[in-house]
Amino acid sequence: MSRVCHKLEDFMRQRRIAREIALQVLYSLEVVEMEAGEAIELYWAHYEAPMDARPFSSLLIEGAWKHRDQIDSLIGGCSANWSIARMSKVDKSILRMAVFELCFCEDIPPKVTMNEAIDLGKVYGSENSGSFINGILDALYAKIHKKNDEQEIAPPPERSE
């Protein structure tokens, strides 16, 4: 296997670890009232985490928590039969993290974000979490792209000579 492939595998592994850490911290923020930064510092103080995973974990945690009202509104708009309050804390945490990635992390392909979230749901959620998360993220992704497709592109200004 080439060096490039190994680096890519390492990068993907670090991203997965970062998402798992973010899930744990976001879940804890659902249970214990504190600031995201404080929760992150507590995690680093009590659990081992690769240094390479920390910046991305922190980005996901702080971003998802800071924008949670906006994110929850987006999730709620794609889950007709489930209010955000009825969702499990694990599913809600995974969805918040994934929606943050979809909306704010343009360098991450949406399908990667969605697949990672579905995998986390299968591992850490209930037996139906993977398909539940998939359904909501698919609907949200379709809404985002439909909205982008409907935006008119302004014609270039006419040149004056």
Swiss-Prot record:
CDD domains, per the entry: Terminator_NusB (cd00619)
GO CC terms: cytosol
Alphabetical list of Pfam families matching this protein: NusB
Any GO molecular function: RNA binding
GO biological process: DNA-templated transcription termination; transcription antitermination
Superkingdom, natural source: Bacteria
InterPro entries: NusB-like_sf (IPR035926), NusB_fam (IPR011605), NusB_RsmB_TIM44 (IPR006027)
Keyword vocabulary terms for this entry: RNA-binding, Transcription, Transcription antitermination, Transcription regulation
PANTHER family from the UniProt entry: ANTITERMINATION NUSB DOMAIN-CONTAINING PROTEIN (PTHR11078:SF3), N UTILIZATION SUBSTANCE PROTEIN B-RELATED (PTHR11078)
Its biological purpose: Involved in transcription antitermination. Required for transcription of ribosomal RNA (rRNA) genes. Binds specifically to the boxA antiterminator sequence of the ribosomal RNA (rrn) operons.
NCBIfam families for this protein: nusB (TIGR01951)
Similarity section: Belongs to the NusB family.
Name used for this protein in its record: Transcription antitermination protein NusB
Lineage of the species this protein comes from: Bacteria, Pseudomonadati, Thermodesulfobacteriota, Syntrophia, Syntrophales
Primary gene name: nusB
